Amino acid sequence: MFHKIKYLLIIMTLFSTVVTANYDKLAYDFNFNDLDGSNLSLSEYKNKVIIVVNVASQCGFTSQYEDMQKVWETYQDKGLIMLGVPSNDFGNQEPGNSKEIKNFCEAKFGITFPMTEKVPVKGENAHPF
């Protein structure tokens, strides 16, 4: 019985994702603001590989910034774009504002890859990406 409920929940989750997803747009059609408040259009990265990672300064996986920076440094000249997208939607693990996030990332991990301002990634106000 438990397995049937589990599978039903998985199917419902997948269905709700399919219903709300916007398949009329490509990744290049979306815009964010960067941590300085400037427009960051993904169309600038056309014909490049874009790795988009949801990040948070107080997450248990915050150390991933170090690996993300290494990947960025290694492959940016080969057409790879690393894009960090901070969100506070998962356990309030990104409480800082853009300036605090930028200072944290640069001071602690030497981040030089593009980062967006903090955006909601779930719920009614989720960023459309």
Which residues fall in each region the model found?
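Bacterial N-terminal signal peptides that target proteins for export
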Residues: 1-8
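Short, internal strand/loop/helix patches
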Residues: 26, 31, 99-129
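N-terminal "domain-start" segment that seeds a small globular fold
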Residues: 20-43, 128
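Conserved helix-turn-beta segment immediately C-terminal to the redox Cys motif
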Residues: 48-50, 58, 62-88, 106-109
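Bacterial N-terminal signal peptides
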Residues: 8-17
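Solvent-exposed loop/turn segments at secondary-structure junctions
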Residues: 57-59, 88-92, 120-123
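Alpha-helical scaffolding within the catalytic cores
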Residues: 36-38, 65-70, 99
